[in-house]
């Protein structure tokens, strides 16, 4: 399963950590240079209203959630 997360803050990091042994892949979209979730997973630097990257998450992920 592939999960997209809008926002790469501490909640996103805790979500990623809770699925570490569950064979779940994450894609995180966050506008900051080094969000907390980037310690564990690849983060895409983009604004939350960037249509191109929102479309990418919608197409690539089985589910998308929000971290804020």
Where are these regions (language model features)?
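ATP-binding N-terminal substructure of ATP-dependent carboxylate-amine bond-forming enzymes
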Residues: 1-68
């Amino acid at each position: 399963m592939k999960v997209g997360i809008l926002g790469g803050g501490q909640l996103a990091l805790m979500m990623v950590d809770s699925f570490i042994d569950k064979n779940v892949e994450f894609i995180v979209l966050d506008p900051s240079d080094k969000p907390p979730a980037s310690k564990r997973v690849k983060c895409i630097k983009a604004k939350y209203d960037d249509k191109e990257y929102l479309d990418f998450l919608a197409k690539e992920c089985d589910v998308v959630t929000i971290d804020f």
